[in-house]
Amino acid sequence: MTQSEPVVEIVTEADAWQPDPRWRPAARLTVLLGEDDHWQRRPRYHEIVRRARDAGLAGASVWRGMEGYGVTSRIHTTRLLDLAENLPIMVMIVDDAELLREFVSGNAELFDTGTVALSAVQVWSSGAGSRP
């Protein structure tokens, strides 16, 4: 008669995680601009936010950076008064990936400068005020 060896199950933290239905897949559109980027004499970031709202996207936010550089490799910073110009601007919009792709395609003239990135994210939906 042979003795069977005990079965040992190794469970890692990742394996033990149970999906929470309040998390749902979404996408994040990130647009990196310079503060001096304009669209028809208005800040380009303002026009992007206005059109995102008009398109019914879930929400948009704009951040002004402290320091950064772009394609010209010139550093723009708030640390020195004489260089505190054309600071980096980041526009972020989170919604369904296909809606964001359609938004960029339908407003391509707004995205001819800067960097546009689309990333997969998870959005917490607590229920109150959440989109379906």
PLM regions and their residue ranges:
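Positively charged, small/polar-rich N-terminal and surface patches that mediate targeting and assembly
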Residues: 1-132
